[in-house]
Design a protein with these regions (language model features):
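Single conserved hydrophobic/aromatic residue that forms the stacking wall/gate
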Residues: 128-137
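Short, structured coil segments at secondary-structure junctions
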Residues: 80-82
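Conserved Lys-Pro-Asp/Glu-containing loop-to-beta segment of HAD-superfamily phosphomonoesterases
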Residues: 94-119
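Substrate-recognition element of Asp-dependent hydrolases with the DxDx(T/V) motif
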Residues: 30-32, 37-45, 49-78
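Acidic, divalent-metal-coordinating active-site segment for phosphoryl/phosphodiester hydrolysis
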Residues: 117-127
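Short active-site oxyanion
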Residues: 60-64, 85, 109-111
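Short, acidic/turn-prone active-site loops that include or flank metal/cofactor-
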Residues: 88-94
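Non-catalytic pre-domain segments flanking phosphatase-related domains
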Residues: 1-32
């Protein structure tokens, strides 16, 4: 019953993920939460985040921020990064996970979601990737 709140993998930081391996495994889309996933809550994009996204683009990943924050927060964070974004995403609703993948031209078989909150990020992603998700599209 509570499996929908457990991520497929747990790591201490986004910055320890081996994105080169993910790309080699065939993943092409990355969806990211922002606050407490990439930077502390409310912080601007820092050098580490900018370097990460430069590397991801170099690898060939398509990226999108999926955030429950308002436009001003997400847009200002993205100014230094330059990827697609969806603000006010209403996670855990699956609607904008689907929309983000449509923006990237990817699907659930080749997209990874990276977030920190169990009841919004993880739950929403697992709702979408469950077998029942086919009924939602």
């Amino acid at each position: 019953m509570f499996n929908c709140f457990f991520p497929d993998e747990y790591l201490d930081s986004t910055y320890v993920i081996n994105f080169d391996d993910l790309y080699a495994q065939g993943y092409r889309g990355l969806l990211f939460d922002i606050d407490n996933t990439l930077v502390p809550h409310g912080a601007p994009a820092d050098e580490r985040a900018c370097a990460l996204f430069a590397h991801l683009k170099e690898l060939g990943f398509k990226c999108c921020f999926l955030s429950n924050n308002q436009y001003e927060r997400v847009s200002s964070f993205n100014d230094a990064i330059g990827v697609q974004f969806i603000e006010n995403a209403h996670k855990p609703s699956t609607k904008n996970y689907i929309r983000a993948m449509e923006l990237l031209g990817t699907d659930r078989s080749n997209t990874v979601f990276i977030g920190d909150q169990l009841f919004t990020d993880i739950y929403g992603c697992l709702l979408y990737t469950s077998d029942a998700a086919d009924d939602l599209t």
